């Protein structure tokens, strides 16, 4: 099921009012939706936008794709920037353990072995030889 963040039109004729909803991409524009996450009133001066940031970030992290207009609203509210930061932080923390997960061997340099031991929190003498450091691993 492909999930979208999009606008659902409400309001009277010539008086548009939109709800920002999470909906299955196959459902009609004003049809069934999963959850309401905000409102958008373009008639008000200035345009009135209310968004539930926590719910939107949750849905974005679960793979929901915003429509073009919803993307503009989220971008202007700063939610997409926060999502990009969260995603980058998650990616960088996931990459660090993978790099230090491999145990050093004889082929590694002393600096690489010391970096591994520092990441593990192991104490060692700064003047230790390579063989002594490998014994600590």
Curated annotation (Swiss-Prot):
The keyword Ribosomal protein applies. SUPFAM superfamilies: Ribosomal protein S16. GO terms for cellular component: cytoplasm; small ribosomal subunit. It holds the Pfam family Ribosomal_S16. One of its GO terms (biological process) is translation. It comes from the Bacteria. Gene3D superfamilies: 3.30.1320.10, SAP domain. GO terms for molecular function: structural constituent of ribosome. Keywords: Ribonucleoprotein, Ribosomal protein. Belongs to the bacterial ribosomal protein bS16 family. NCBIfam families: S16. PANTHER family: 30S RIBOSOMAL PROTEIN S16 (PTHR12919), SMALL RIBOSOMAL SUBUNIT PROTEIN BS16M (PTHR12919:SF20). HAMAP family: Ribosomal_bS16 (MF_00385). This is Small ribosomal subunit protein bS16. The lineage of its organism: Bacteria, Bacillati, Bacillota, Bacilli, Lactobacillales.
């Amino acid at each position: 099921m492909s999930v979208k963040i999009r606008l659902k039109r409400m309001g009277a004729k010539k008086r548009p009012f939109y709800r920002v909803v999470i909906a299955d991409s196959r459902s009609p524009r004003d049809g069934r939706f999963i959850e309401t996450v905000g409102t958008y009133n373009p008639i008000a001066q200035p345009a009135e936008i209310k968004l539930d940031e926590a719910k939107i970030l949750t849905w974005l992290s679960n793979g929901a794709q915003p429509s073009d207009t919803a993307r503009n609203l989220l971008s202007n509210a700063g939610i997409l920037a926060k999502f990009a930061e969260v995603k980058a932080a998650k990616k960088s923390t996931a990459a660090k353990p993978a790099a230090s997960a491999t145990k050093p061997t004889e082929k590694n340099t002393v600096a690489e072995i010391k970096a591994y031991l520092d990441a593990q929190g192991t104490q060692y003498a700064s003047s230790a030889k390579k063989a002594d450091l490998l014994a600590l691993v």
